[in-house]
A protein has these predicted regions:
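Hydrophobic face of amphipathic alpha-helices that form TPR/SEL1-like repeat modules
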Residues: 1-10, 39-46, 50, 75-82, ...
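Glycine- and small/polar-enriched repetitive beta-structure motifs of secreted/surface proteins
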Residues: 6, 82, 94-97, 205, ...
């Protein structure tokens, strides 16, 4: 029932029927099949085949978690971390993540690494974060590969090693992880751990930008603005600044404001410039505050 539910939920090998998938998961879960309990929780969390119900999601995640199922433990932890269907409790999230991480669950290891890095729900421990990221990264988990790259880049929990940072960013970027793509672009832009190459930097920024990553959209806009790694194109600069600004990215709001103020790549509009500067300024952007 659980396997058939998987096929019906995804439409892989059978016509997609999410409602029927939920029925099958429910039957399997009530029959004691632990993976189906977690799958049913996911359906309730995402509203797949059933009305979204975060409390029911937590209920089924908990049932699978208490049976020792690592994905269920991880999903329950994330609910605690985000306050979805349950009161937010970072310490409870850590307890469940520890259980899943001990079973080698890469996602749990990576999220637990984030909490150790930030000291959320547990003591701040950069060395432990590095260890957890390494365990997850070696299993091919892109968020952990990116985080591990950053540890090597800045020397957090380990000795600084820019070359290793590039290696891990590249592994995550190859799996289309947007932040890793952007970070790899930064390495190429500034020659950190790799030979400086503005063209490659632009290529990586564009890959991340097309996946909606605001910092990369802003960086790509700046490259078009100044003709770095690409032919100068003020209109394209505005286009990319707009995309990042729409996501509330302060640097892009400020840069776009200047385009409107000066009429570069877009029709001059001082009122729009002021609005954008204010949006950036209210988020603490010193450039936005100064321009405003």
């Amino acid at each position: 029932q659980g396997i058939l539910g998987d096929l019906l939920l995804t439409g892989n090998g059978a016509p997609e029927d999410k409602a029927r998938a939920v029925e099958l998961y429910g039957a399997a879960a009530k029959g004691g099949y632990v993976p189906a309990m977690c799958d049913l929780g996911l359906c309730y969390e995402n509203g797949d085949g059933v009305e979204e119900d975060l409390r029911h999601a937590v209920l089924w995640y908990r049932k699978s978690a208490e049976e020792g199922y690592a994905p269920g433990q991880c999903n329950l932890a994330v609910c605690y971390l985000n306050g979805n269907g349950v009161e937010r409790d970072a310490a409870a999230a850590v307890r469940w993540l520890e259980k899943a991480a001990a079973q080698g669950n890469a996602r749990a290891q990576s999220i637990l690494g984030d909490l150790c890095r930030d000291g959320e729900g547990t003591e701040m421990d950069a060395a432990r974060a590095f260890q957890l990221y390494t365990q997850a990264a070696e299993q091919g988990y892109p968020p952990a590969q990116c985080a591990l790259g950053y540890c090597y880049e800045v020397g957090s929990g380990t000795a600084e090693d820019k070359t290793k940072a590039v290696e891990w960013y590249a592994r995550a970027a190859e799996q289309e992880h947007p932040r890793a793509m952007c970070n790899l672009g930064l390495c190429y832009e500034y020659g950190e751990g790799v030979a400086e190459d503005k063209t490659k930097a632009a290529e990586w920024y564009e890959k991340a930008a097309r996946r909606g990553y605001a910092p990369a959209q802003c960086n790509l806009g700046f490259f078009y603005d100044r003709g770095v790694g690409v032919a100068e194109d003020a209109a394209k600069a505005v286009e990319w600044y707009e995309r990042a600004a729409e996501q509330g990215y302060p640097r892009a709001q400020c840069n776009l404001g200047y385009c409107y103020e000066s009429g570069k790549g877009v029709k001059e509009d001082k009122a729009r410039a002021v609005k954008l500067y204010r949006q950036a300024a209210e988020q603490g952007s010193s450039a936005g505050q100064c321009n405003l």
